[in-house]
Regions:
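Acyl-donor (CoA/ACP) binding surface of acyl/acetyltransferases
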Residues: 1-56, 86-186
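A generic secondary-structure signal
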Residues: 73-77, 139
């Protein structure tokens, strides 16, 4: 992000956040993506414990209370500071929280913006990661005017590598990070 324009849409997102109302990021045929709110944390905590996505190198904390404290600070600061973050993914038909996906500044990628997605185990294999990924890519381009995004995936995570490929990401490099061999896509 080289320059930053304050437009009416930005001001409306800022107003909603300061009023404690989660900003709706995107809506697809089957999914709603919106900013995470405190009441989402218990459901998300259960999904995070299942594994599958590293939240910007922050491990899942030991207790729900610790996670709640961490996430409430994240909610108060990240969305306001960056105008993006990791968002709650809701299956519209059931109203269930099925995962979390979004954009974050990755210390592992020298502060480049990274796309991440985690769908709960019982909802995997239904195309939800790809569906919310496409919505996030459109939001990143149309709303945030981001010119470059990355995904960082463990080389053994074939499912996530496949999703990234379907989203148009291609191999960029390989690295060893925290002892895990990774493939970086851009």
């Amino acid at each position: 992000m080289e320059e930053f324009d304050i437009d009416p849409a930005f001001l409306e997102r800022d107003r909603l956040r300061k009023s404690g109302i989660p900003v709706k990021i995107a809506e697809t045929e089957r999914l709603l993506l919106r900013e995470t709110i405190s009441s989402d944390i218990p459901d998300l905590y259960e999904i995070w414990k299942q594994g599958g996505m590293v939240r910007g190198t922050v491990p899942v904390l030991d207790t729900l209370d610790e996670e709640t404290e961490f996430m409430e600070a994240y909610i108060r600061h990240a969305y306001l500071f960056y105008d993006f973050g990791l968002w709650t993914v809701i299956e519209k038909q059931s109203g269930q929280i099925i995962g979390q996906a979004g954009l974050f500044v990755s210390e592992l990628l020298d502060d480049a913006v990274e796309l991440g997605y985690l769908i709960g185990q019982s909802y995997r294999g239904k195309g939800y990661a790809q569906e919310c990924g496409r919505a996030i890519l459109a939001y990143a381009e149309e709303v945030l005017d981001l010119e470059e995004l990355h995904v960082l995936i463990e080389r053994t995570n074939d499912t996530s590598l496949h999703v990234a490929q379907k989203l148009g990401f291609g191999p960029y490099g390989q690295d060893q990070i925290h002892g895990a061999e990774t493939a970086e896509d851009t």
